[in-house]
């Protein structure tokens, strides 16, 4: 097919259908479908795999979706090209015109993570979300860690990104560098519909399907984290959530320079590198520090470290505080109170990963 053939067969594919004068864009449809599937898969992991309540996450959805859209839009105005629409529209009209694209994933993730760090520690303190675990012949009531929810929810963000990238295709945006027909012969054979629409009229050239490459790689990242990660024996609570930041940061760091020049933003590349570095540092800390101290309450830690000055007072104090919520904690402290080894509580999150 020659370039002239491309020109004569090209058509606007951004609109899925119309309701009266309202055009429903494919971009919005793919973003919505991505959100819905991500929510479903997160709930499946929580309810069926970890055996814990999905309700805290369910209610967070009503906070997380608008927050993520807001963060993605703000970030697109800061580091992307969404601000160009201000030349023809007022700020509010341009900012809330999601149908035309302009959502930067990093901004959505960052703002949603901040919201989650505030929301989940508060909500999970409610007794109705505690989990009863049987160890031997005894039952213990445990407060579910925020990290358990993070492991179930965060990797599912990749699902939204896998599907959402197809919105870029229908909008004919965020494409790769100029390509020859020979380079995309495989695409013409396997996905002729995509191939025929990779001739971008604004540049007058055939381009690599950047959206397809990133979507495909994210798909395998998702399978590796969501399913494969559950079979890693020595992992800690939080590792799967952290793996998302590492994988996505590395992918974007490698893929960003591959974008067509009009869609390359230096700030986006820097943020992608920071995402990956943040994930790597967090993973190291999670294994060396967080997993060992995560379950300590501050006062328990201080009391244990000063036990040699008033052992009996500590024992009486801990006995008086024993209840269903911290029974295992007290037994561990009482067991170790006359010993001097480094006293670390076994992370309670392991119960949920073992199917209790």
UniProtKB/Swiss-Prot annotation:
Q: Is Iron tagged as a keyword?
A: no
UniProt binding sites for a 1,2-diacyl-sn-glycero-3-phospho-(1'-sn-glycerol): 165
Q: Which PROSITE patterns does UniProt cross-reference here?
A: LGT
Q: How does it sit in the membrane?
A: Multi-pass membrane protein
Q: Which GO terms describe its biological process?
A: lipoprotein biosynthetic process
- EC number(s) per entry: 2.5.1.145
One GO location term (cellular component): plasma membrane
- Keyword Aminoacyl-tRNA synthetase recorded: no
Query: What InterPro entries does the record point to?
Result: Lgt
A single GO molecular function term of this UniProt record: phosphatidylglycerol-prolipoprotein diacylglyceryl transferase activity
Q: Principal localization?
A: membrane
UniProt pathway annotation: Protein modification; lipoprotein biosynthesis (diacylglyceryl transfer)
Xref: HAMAP family:
Lgt
List, alphabetically, the NCBIfam families matched.
lgt
- So what family is this one in? Belongs to the Lgt family.
Q: What is this protein called?
A: Phosphatidylglycerol--prolipoprotein diacylglyceryl transferase
Q: Which organism is it from?
A: Malacoplasma penetrans (strain HF-2)
> Which gene is this protein's source?
lgt
């Amino acid at each position: 097919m020659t370039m002239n053939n491309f020109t004569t067969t090209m058509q606007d594919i951004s609109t899925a259908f119309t309701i009266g004068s309202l055009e429903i864009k494919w971009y919005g449809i793919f973003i919505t479908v991505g959100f819905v599937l991500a929510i479903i898969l997160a709930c499946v992991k929580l309810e069926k795999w970890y055996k814990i309540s999905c309700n805290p996450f369910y209610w967070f959805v009503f906070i997380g979706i608008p927050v993520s859209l807001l963060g993605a839009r703000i970030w697109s105005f800061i580091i992307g090209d969404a601000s160009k629409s201000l030349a023809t529209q007022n700020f509010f009209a341009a900012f809330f015109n999601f149908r035309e694209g302009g959502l930067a994933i990093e901004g959505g993730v960052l703002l949603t993570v901040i919201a989650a760090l505030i929301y989940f520690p508060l909500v999970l303190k409610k007794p109705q979300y505690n989990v009863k675990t049987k160890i031997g012949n005894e039952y213990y009531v445990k407060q579910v860690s925020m990290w358990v929810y993070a492991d179930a929810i965060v990797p599912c963000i990749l699902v939204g990104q896998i599907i959402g990238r197809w919105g870029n295709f229908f909008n004919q945006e965020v494409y790769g560098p100029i390509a020859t027909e020979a380079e995309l012969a495989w695409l013409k054979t396997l996905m002729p519909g995509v191939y025929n629409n990779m001739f971008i009229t604004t540049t007058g050239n055939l381009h690599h399907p950047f959206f397809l490459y990133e979507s495909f790689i994210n798909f395998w990242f998702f399978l590796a984290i969501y399913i494969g990660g559950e079979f890693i024996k020595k992992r800690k609570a939080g590792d799967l959530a952290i793996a998302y930041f590492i994988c996505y940061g590395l992918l974007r760091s490698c893929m960003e320079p591959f974008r067509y020049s009009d869609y390359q933003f230096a700030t986006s590349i820097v943020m992608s590198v920071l995402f990956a570095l943040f994930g790597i540092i967090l993973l190291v800390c999670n294994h060396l520090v967080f997993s060992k101290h995560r379950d300590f309450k501050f006062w328990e830690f201080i009391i244990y470290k000063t036990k040699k000055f008033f052992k009996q007072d500590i024992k009486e104090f801990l006995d008086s505080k024993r209840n269903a919520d911290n029974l295992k904690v007290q037994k561990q402290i009482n067991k170790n109170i006359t010993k001097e080894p480094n006293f670390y509580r076994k992370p309670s999150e392991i119960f949920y990963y073992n199917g209790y």
